[in-house]
């Protein structure tokens, strides 16, 4: 890895770069953009690239990685590539085929990390969000411990170097950790995490179990109308973050990213803007003081931008518990 690429050691012995590039974009953004920005991100110094079946961009992201390998910029082992198992594939017999399909799209031999994208199982099939005639999402009931066993088999088969989860709460993590015959612990839990929703209790729990917390929406969110309330406050306009940005001569986004790194959180920086992609790698060039960190801690208001109200009645809805 690049020297500026600080990494964290995972509980299975592999290493994950602490700064990642998030590739999700709303459907109205042309897929070709994902190819372009992922190449830019690798050129800017990002080595950790985060995708998923849900994002419908694995072909483009895989092509970007392969083209940067082909032109000699990086080797495959320099890149840490993540994909995720979507909720319609939780039944154990569907897990490996889903990963193989993701690999085929990206044209890669393995992923560095494969995550269960969400604990909320949905009716199997090709539709990402299966609904009934009334437009209600159709749930599936799957024992996630059996899903996890299928994930472990993917690791044993060499299709995924590491395996983890996403959007799990403490109880859901404990269910996996306490599973009889557990072979591999999840290496991480990727969750929405930013100064307005800092997940400090979940972070402490994960640290106590040697599970890395990975932050998505670390810069707030791109306010996709399908999930995000347009009236929610804009994180990067927060006066405290803006004042700290001024103090350190950085952007509010860099303050929000640096905050996570200093609390031991791996952070995903999602941007489709070339200048901001280059800017975000400056996160290693400065430090926040203990006082700065306390000021940002004080912004927490348990605000999650991603409001999956249509899923709130799901038995595995992660926000039903305190953390």
Swiss-Prot record:
Instruction: Name one molecular function that GO assigns to this entry.
Output: geranylgeranyl reductase activity
Q: Which reaction does it catalyse?
A: a 3alpha-hydroxysteroid + NADP(+) = a 3-oxosteroid + NADPH + H(+); a 3alpha-hydroxysteroid + NAD(+) = a 3-oxosteroid + NADH + H(+); prostaglandin F2alpha + NADP(+) = prostaglandin D2 + NADPH + H(+); testosterone + NAD(+) = androst-4-ene-3,17-dione + NADH + H(+)
Residues with site note (Lowers pKa of active site Tyr): 84
**UniProt: NADP(+) binding residues:** 20-24, 50, 166-167, 190, 216-221, 270-280
UniProt xrefs under Pfam families? Aldo_ket_red
Q: What is its EC number?
A: 1.1.1.-, 1.1.1.210, 1.1.1.53, 1.1.1.62
Q: Does the keyword Iron-sulfur apply?
A: no
Q: What is its main location?
A: cytoplasm
Q: Which InterPro entries match?
A: AKR (IPR020471), AKR1C (IPR044482), Aldo/ket_reductase_CS (IPR018170), NADP_OxRdtase_dom (IPR023210), NADP_OxRdtase_dom_sf (IPR036812)
Q: Which residues form a coiled coil?
A: none
Give a GO cellular-component term.
Answer: cytoplasm
Signal sequence, start to end: none
Keywords noted in UniProt: Cytoplasm, Lipid metabolism, NAD, NADP, Oxidoreductase
* Residues annotated as catalytic: 55 (proton donor)
Q: Where does substrate bind?
A: 117
Family, per entry: Belongs to the aldo/keto reductase family.
What does this gene product do? Cytosolic aldo-keto reductase that catalyzes the NADH and NADPH-dependent reduction of ketosteroids to hydroxysteroids. Acts as a NAD(P)(H)-dependent 3-, 17- and 20-ketosteroid reductase on the steroid nucleus and side chain and regulates the metabolism of androgens, estrogens and progesterone. Displays the ability to catalyze both oxidation and reduction in vitro, but most probably acts as a reductase in vivo since the oxidase activity measured in vitro is inhibited by physiological concentration of NADPH.
Task: Name it.
Answer: Aldo-keto reductase family 1 member C3
